[in-house]
Amino acid sequence: MRDKLVAMLELGRKAFESADSAVELQEIRVRFLGKKGELTAIMKGMGQLTPEQRPVVGALANQVKSELEELFEERSRIVGQQEMDKRLKQERVDVTLPGRRNSCGTKHPVTLVIEEITDIFSALGFSVAEGPEIEQDFYNFEALNMPKDHPARDMQDTFYINEDVVLRTHTSPVQIRTMLKHAPPVRVIAPGTVYRRDSDITHTPMFHQVEGFLVDRNITFGDLKGILTSFLSQIFGKGLNVRFRPSFFPFTEPSAEVDIQCVMCKGKGCRVCKNSGWLEILGSGMIDPEVFKSVDYDSETYSGFAFGMGVERIAMLKYGVNDLRLFFENDVRFLRQF
């Protein structure tokens, strides 16, 4: 049995030293040291030895096992390093090669429309202002002629952070913040994200809006009509029929909804315009004196108008998109079309 152990050790040493891959090393380890390996087979014959021989053979068996395990570990380190060196050599990177440019994406259609709206109003003399999306109740409601318990608040389903803080339901709070900081004349648009508790094919809980307002001496409804008619003809094309309908907003008086001739059917009537030939596009009106009172503007000296529009709605009509939710699903097949 001693001779078998010595012979197995020599055979194992040669096998480990000649192995040149991790897979081969593992196969050799199992062959000699596994549960059904050669060492286990030899040790099964221990019962045939005399009591005096067993300790000697057992010690030799343990020595052989230890040496084979050390050979396996040492050769594994060597082979592992060789394989790593080979891999690094094969996967070498030539740092002198010219770099590859990242492929550029495209702007989101909502971003394109916001930029176009901004460009049009900038050419008309408007500057751009921004405000916080988490807004105080005062700026979102009270200063816009909607005090606590005012029935007009029911027109908008609001996300409340707490009793006095909300996710803004429109970008009109920017109008209040701007007028509190600047004396007339002011001519500003405020694009931004707004939030309302509504979700269907034409509404989402988060969408984009552009608020605009102008305050100066002797501003009339005719000025409002001229500005909006010019804007709509530039965004949708010349020759567009526009109409103003009387409406109600708590922060403007008089107020008007602005409709355009349906861009889908050219006024003939279709499913999109509900066979009316017209599409509601934005709300507008002359700024209410109560709003001027909130910002310490003299309504006897100054007058002004305000308007607001949903960017996604304009994008839907401009690009012929029939489902508002497509703008928020991040489908590359859809976005690549713009």
From Swiss-Prot:
Q: What does the Swiss-Prot or TrEMBL cofactor note state?
A: Binds 2 magnesium ions per tetramer.
The reaction(s) catalysed by this protein are: tRNA(Phe) + L-phenylalanine + ATP = L-phenylalanyl-tRNA(Phe) + AMP + diphosphate + H(+)
A GO-annotated cellular component: cytoplasm
Keyword tags: Aminoacyl-tRNA synthetase, ATP-binding, Cytoplasm, Ligase, Magnesium, Metal-binding, Nucleotide-binding, Protein biosynthesis
| GO biological processes | phenylalanyl-tRNA aminoacylation
Primary site of residence? cytoplasm
The places in or outside the cell where this protein is found are:
Cytoplasm
Query: Which PANTHER family does its entry note?
Result: PHENYLALANINE--TRNA LIGASE, MITOCHONDRIAL, PHENYLALANYL-TRNA SYNTHETASE
Q: What name has this protein been given in UniProt?
A: Phenylalanine--tRNA ligase alpha subunit
Q: Which species does the entry assign this protein to?
A: Syntrophotalea carbinolica (strain DSM 2380 / NBRC 103641 / GraBd1)
